Amino acid sequence: MPMTNQELNKFLSETHVAVISTVDADNRPRSAPIWYEWKDGAAYLFTGRRTLKWRNIQDNPNVSLCVDWREPPYRSAIIQGTAEEVEVDM
């Protein structure tokens, strides 16, 4: 059953590990777990600059992010878009 926008925002705000899919150098999909924060309608992803997912995003910023809850009531959201680097204060 589809979630309302309010339910979706609440779900994405509560869950902090997702699976990101990127495109590798051979043009194949590559998926990996990633930490994120949902803020103001956007997913902010956290990864190191030496990771394969970072290199893939630098070469091809098209990504898909899957967030799911694997216990009843099962829920999931898939976000497709373009990744871009954002500077943050730590």
Predicted regions and their residues:
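Active-site-adjacent beta-strand anchor residues
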Residues: 46-47
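Extreme N-terminal tail/first-helix region
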Residues: 1-17, 73, 88
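A short, well-structured catalytic beta-strand-centered motif of the EAL phosphodiesterase domain
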Residues: 33-38
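Short, structured beta-strand-loop surface elements
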Residues: 50-90
